[in-house]
């Protein structure tokens, strides 16, 4: 029983780490060009002031905005091959950094 629980715990942690790594890679691929420097008014990664009002919209709305494009941001940012779920991972990654 302990082995069963431990193996599932390890598998869950490996999966969570993979998602974190995936989110970072997606961010670097499609978001960092603007969100690391504030290009065209993009809120910078980790900047609490710039994200404060936006973060109140919640992950789902921010993901939809990123998917559709908003303001100076094109649809899907610079990740035209990303799925909705990948865009969501990138949004979650950015929110976790504030």
Regions found by a protein language model. Name each.
Residues 35-64:
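Gly/Gly-Pro-rich "capping" loops immediately C-terminal to redox-active cysteine motifs
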Residues 21-30, 40:
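Local sequence-structure signature of Cys/Sec-based thiol-disulfide redox active-site neighborhoods
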Residues 1-21, 98:
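N-terminal export/targeting leaders of redox proteins
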Residues 44, 65-89, 94-97:
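Axial heme c-ligation environment in periplasmic c-type cytochrome domains
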Residues 28-37, 90:
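The canonical Cys-X-X-Cys-His
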Residues 22, 26, 50, 61, ...:
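Extracytoplasmic/secreted proteins, especially bacterial periplasmic and envelope-associated proteins
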């Amino acid at each position: 029983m302990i082995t069963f629980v431990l193996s599932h715990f390890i598998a869950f942690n490996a999966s969570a780490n993979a998602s974190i790594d995936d989110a970072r890679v997606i961010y670097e691929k499609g978001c960092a060009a603007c969100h690391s420097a504030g290009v065209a008014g993009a809120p910078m990664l980790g900047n609490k002031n710039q994200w404060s009002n936006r973060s109140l919209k919640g992950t789902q709305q921010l993901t939809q905005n990123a998917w559709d494009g908003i303001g100076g941001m094109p649809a899907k940012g610079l990740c035209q091959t990303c799925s909705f779920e990948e865009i969501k991972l990138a949004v979650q990654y950015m929110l976790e950094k504030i």
